[in-house]
Amino acid sequence: MNKNEGRKGLFHIMFERSTLVILLLLVQIIFFIVCINWINEYFIKFYTICYILGSILVIYIVNTKGNPMYKIAWVIPILVIPVFGALLYIFVRLQLETKLMSARIEKIRRKTKKYLKTDEMIKHELENNNPALNNLANYFEEFAGYPTYKNTKAKYFPSGEAKLEELKLELEKAKKFIFLEYFIVAEGKMWGEILEILKRKVKEGVEVRFMYDGTCTFKLLPFSYPKYMNSLGIKCKMFSPIRPVLSTYQNNRDHRKIVVIDGHTAFTGGINLADEYINEKELFGHWKDTAIMVKGEAVKSFTIMFLQMWDVTEKSEEDYEKYINDIEYENDLHLKEEGYMIPFGDCPMD
């Protein structure tokens, strides 16, 4: 390697986005340390103020509505370490961006609640034939917001390799739309093979949307990757890009792994879009994870889950009814399975 190549490599390391983000975060940490040192000069007065503030905060927290475990998790550190606990609580509570995101998600959930209702016939069956399962189904619908379905079958994949082969076959069958939502995406064999299929499907007129978590910008994908995807005709966005700001909002990540194809087929599980998940790349020895494929009525919940998260950062409201498949599954013999299915999910704010 000559000197010029070495300089270019050093320049790239110094000015790549992840390096700059880390440096800016370090600057903010140093600033806080300087502030703490300044406070030490007036420690007694400052400690007294924080002790009084902590006492007020404890009274406030105890009297607010909410989960008792959440309250205890704050009350203990505030009482044990008044300076740190009180300031940390104020810092977390003042995270406006987190509150705005939570409010946006709650608004979308209220809007889409009408699409997530258990069929009355299924409710009647459960009430009469399986009271225990009926209680569980009622709990999921009332508190989690997800209904119970029939006419659905599932296939289990014991490895990422098995899932990838089935996923490619199903993607090739797409006629209307393909939705993908993942936590980790990395260029390589797995993502490369899927991307080639998506490119072909775009040319065939299939709508393709792709959403991934912003942590991928550190080392896995360039910050401009959504722009590249959009140039291919794939609607793409990052959820919560990493920014050089000290904030609890950075911890709200989208860990979901969802694929929806034409509203009748879905994939989920623990497999991300990176080569270590199919053992083409070794990180921590042989990678063992699982996934499932769902076909039938229950895919409706996966479709809505994806659109809800996509809608979080959109200014306009999504037309959900356009993507909720209205195919009658009752007469589809290959979907006749005994039992019921309740797909459910969380969100980055949970």
PLM region descriptions:
Residues 44-48:
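Membrane-targeting alpha-helical segments
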